[in-house]
Structure formats: C-alpha cells, structure tokens
C-alpha cells in the first residue's frame, strides 16, 4: 500500500491542491463569501501548487518537492495559526480587515474552512515527503 501511495504521491497531492483551489474559488465567486487576510495568504500558497504539482506529476519529476515543500509548509503554518485564532477565545489579529480571521464558516456542517486547509496542506506535505524519487 505504501508503495502505491509513494508511486502516485504527486498525483494525489495535485488532486488535493486542485480540490482546494476549486472549493476556494467556489466559495468566493459562487457563494460570495469574502475571505479574510489569512485566507488570502493561504491561497497565495495553494494556487501555485496546483500548476506546479500538475506539471511535476505529468513529467514524473519528484525533484520539484525541494522547491514546493517550503511553500506547502508555510500554508500549513498559516492555516494552523488561523485555527488557533478561531478556537482560542480572546485571540485576535490586528491585521484582519473587514472580515475577521476568527469568523467560523463551516464546510459540511462541522469542519471550518481553516481546518480543511490544515488537512489539505498537511496531506500535501506528507505526500511530498513520501514521494518516490523519479529523476535527479
């Protein structure tokens, strides 16, 4: 099983980043949910991953993980920080604009958007670490 995951880790990471990008765009432009500043930072980390992971999966080039792993770890850190903002009472961020970074918006009735982001970035990071070496 682990060999299967390692063999297709780039494809799985790409699929997760595509799903995250599509859900983010859906919430912003279809449901008109205005993102907070931390959500924008997470998008800055996520959106390029979709393109880069797609190209590297197509080319079976796992050496790209050296360049995109820090970006995924940064996105994970930002999303963990936002979960703390939402879950720890009294924590507030001064840079939040019109939309508070601690406002909870739920996916599937029980998972907040930042928690879904933690899961997505965490899975991408794990998959990049497990990626089978193809070239290089």
Swiss-Prot record:
Keyword Oxidoreductase: yes
Gene3D superfamilies registered for this protein in UniProt: DsbB-like (1.20.1550.10)
Chief location bin: membrane
GO molecular function: protein-disulfide reductase activity
Membrane topology, from the record: Multi-pass membrane protein
Cysteine pairings via disulfide bonds: 36-39, 96-101
GO CC entries: plasma membrane
Residue ranges of the TM segments: 7-26, 41-60, 67-84, 109-131
Superkingdom of source: Bacteria
Subcellular location as annotated: Cell inner membrane
Sequence similarity: Belongs to the DsbB family. BdbC subfamily.
Function summary: Required for disulfide bond formation in some proteins.
Protein name in UniProt: Probable disulfide formation protein
Species annotation: Chlamydia pneumoniae
């Amino acid at each position: 099983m682990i060999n299967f995951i390692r063999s297709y880790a780039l494809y799985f990471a790409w699929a997760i980043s595509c799903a995250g990008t599509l859900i983010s765009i859906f919430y912003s432009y279809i449901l008109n949910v205005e993102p907070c500043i931390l959500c924008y930072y997470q998008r800055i980390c996520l959106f390029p991953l979709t393109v880069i992971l797609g190209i590297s999966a197509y080319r079976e080039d796992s050496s790209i993980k050296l360049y995109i792993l820090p970006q995924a770890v940064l996105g994970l850190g930002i999303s963990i920080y936002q979960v703390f903002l939402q879950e720890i009472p009294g924590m507030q961020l001064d840079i939040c604009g019109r939309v508070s970074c601690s406002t909870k918006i739920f996916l599937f009735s029980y998972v907040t958007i930042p928690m879904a982001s933690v899961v997505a970035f965490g899975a991408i990071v794990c998959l990049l670490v497990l990626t089978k070496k193809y070239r290089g």
